[in-house]
């Protein structure tokens, strides 16, 4: 069971769905998470799959909805995928808020930030975020993928 679950954490598995390869992956390749001076590459699972086992199982169960969407044709073309991006992105963002951006905090923490090394804007925003108990995704929603446009009818 664990072996199969870990196989679904690979970049290859994530990209086996052409909607992921043609859309989010192409955006991700243009970010610092993909290519950077340190050579540390963040993968899909680093941001989208929790490390604690029980949270990982819950995420995998929730991911079955995305597979269902693919199988039933709801997001089986680029056009359909993009039509549902707002809904899909908000699901991810809501989950990250609920977990206090747990996956971000696997690598980042306010306590480890050297604010004096940040530019004035980042220093100010990070200090305010700590004071206001904000979580990473509140400011960094577009860090790995383009933020989708909110639909005219935001009840979607």
For each predicted feature, which ranges?
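Short sequence/structural segments immediately N-terminal
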Residues: 1-156
